[in-house]
Amino acid sequence: MADTLPPTDRSCDISQPLERLSPDEALKAGSEYLRGTIALGLLDRITSAVPGDDIKLMKFHGIYQQDDRDVRDERRRQKLEPAFQFMIRVRLPGGICTTERWLKISELACAHGNETLRMTTRQTFQFHWVLKHNIVPVIRGLHEVLLDTVAACGDDSRGVMATVNPQFPALQAELAALAKTVSDHVIPKTRGYHEIWYGEERIASSEPEEPFYGRTYMPRKFKIGFVIPPNNDIDIYAQDLGYIAIAGKDGKIAGFNIAIGGGMGRTDKVPHTYPRTASVIGFITPDRLISVTEAVMGVQRDYGNRADRSRARFKYTIDDKGLDWIKLAIEDRAGLLEPARPYHFTSNADIYGWVESDDGYHHFTLFVENGRLNRDTLDKIARIAHVHKGHFRLTPNQNLMIANVATADKPKIDALLVGSGLIAFNEHSVLRLNSMACVAFPTCGLAMADSERYLPTLITKIEGILTRYNLQDEPITLRMTGCPNGCSRPFIAEIGLTGRAPGKYNLYLGGGFHGQRLNRLYRENIGEAAILEALDEVLRHYATERLPDEHFGDFTIRAGIIREVTEGRFSND
């Protein structure tokens, strides 16, 4: 295979000895397929933390060690260790959640997660504030409803996303099933997870424990998603591997356009890191889905940078090797790709409220600001779950869909929504409905500034500006993160804010309305007053100078307010 490809630099990839690569590669190789000393660390009651190497390995199990950063300095003054706790992320392909699973997850969140639950931008749940001795009860509780946390984090294939669009129920169901098939295929196969968390015995076997990943897994995380045009709700161009469904004349999926190399993360003041939108390289029929997925991931596994983790994502492999070389490498493994087929996107937002699909079912999308569910909201949704005969869908915009409600059952669900006050989306501005924020403070160890806790307040102030210029009904996407890693995909928002320090943010403008274009830095390291001043000026021009139906991001480029980003590698210019 590889000997048919043009020569390429392999000085940083899996072909090199471990001593020439990042220390993380040796850690993975020596971990006994992600077992490490995790089981022993959980037994240590002297500390509420786990050993450093196990912190990294536990990510492959869907678990992050964190601490309460609001009290970190005070605990340091008192000579106490940080208030360690853990975030646990569920594997939930396509964001599909049965009512039984919802009730169990809600129960676990209230018992072990500080009575709060977070829906994420990748259509799954996160438990926060879980103490070390409660990790096993949470994971075993999930196992009771056949859920797990395998590969929700770590250098592997993360949770697989799929469009949530009730207007195409048959296509949506087909796509969700394919997302689960791919997810089940690409997760690590090590039995270490079962041994550590379920207490199973290790069984000797002559079969390879990780036939695809090997001992060192992927160079970095690898994200896969499926989308049905015209709604780009999953932000397909932010995926390492994106499948754009193309419908046939029979109403079924005829195949997929393949988009590769998307990714949001960057590091401030490090110009060789940058976000990138995925490149469409061809089309395949559904029967080739698994083989092509393996081929794309295999190319990144074998040629991705394992020496410098800041350059280890697939987007950098593509830009270093060249898109044509990468496509050749994929075709070398999986066969030739057909030319990409036409498609178009119109939005990446959710459709709120009730929608009736052509199969006669009804679906209600509930706005959940920044995906945060407190005890009161969990209890209200639990009452719906007890009577709902369909299922729930978590959306990529951190909202919740009550799916597949029969006409006869709609009045009952509607009464519960109205009676509980959950129907409130029409009370929010269009800007708020099109906003997202990551968790950031106080739990995320990477955060430099607030995000989830601050964005609602900032939006209220921006709403005043929009009203002043009669723009309150204009759909504008706004996303905020507490650091430049980009978990809420801020670099493709029309307005993006990324944290630099407490109360300070970088302001980005010019992203595409449906996630098709990166934005560019407009103001650096500024506080609230400067953010509002900058937005006031730009929105004032937008109000008077925009063309009919011109989106805000498009206007900022046409008006010369910001230069268009044509490729991610030029976004720092």
UniProtKB/Swiss-Prot annotation:
UniProt-annotated binding residues for [4Fe-4S] cluster: 438, 444, 483, 487
Key words, A-Z: 4Fe-4S, Amino-acid biosynthesis, Cysteine biosynthesis, Heme, Iron, Iron-sulfur, Metal-binding, NADP, Oxidoreductase
General function of this protein: Component of the sulfite reductase complex that catalyzes the 6-electron reduction of sulfite to sulfide. This is one of several activities required for the biosynthesis of L-cysteine from sulfate.
Stated name of the protein: Sulfite reductase [NADPH] hemoprotein beta-component
Subunit structure: Alpha(8)-beta(8). The alpha component is a flavoprotein, the beta component is a hemoprotein.
Species name: Nitrosomonas eutropha (strain DSM 101675 / C91 / Nm57)
Cofactor(s) named in the record: siroheme; [4Fe-4S] cluster
Catalytic activity: hydrogen sulfide + 3 NADP(+) + 3 H2O = sulfite + 3 NADPH + 4 H(+)
Chain positions recorded as siroheme binding sites: 487
Pfam families xref list: NIR_SIR (PF01077), NIR_SIR_ferr (PF03460)
One annotated Gene Ontology cellular component of this protein: sulfite reductase complex (NADPH)
PROSITE patterns: NIR_SIR
Binding note for cofactor: Binds 1 siroheme per subunit.
TM helices/strands, residue ranges: none
Species classification: Bacteria, Pseudomonadati, Pseudomonadota, Betaproteobacteria, Nitrosomonadales
GO biological-process terms attached to the record: cysteine biosynthetic process; hydrogen sulfide biosynthetic process; sulfate assimilation
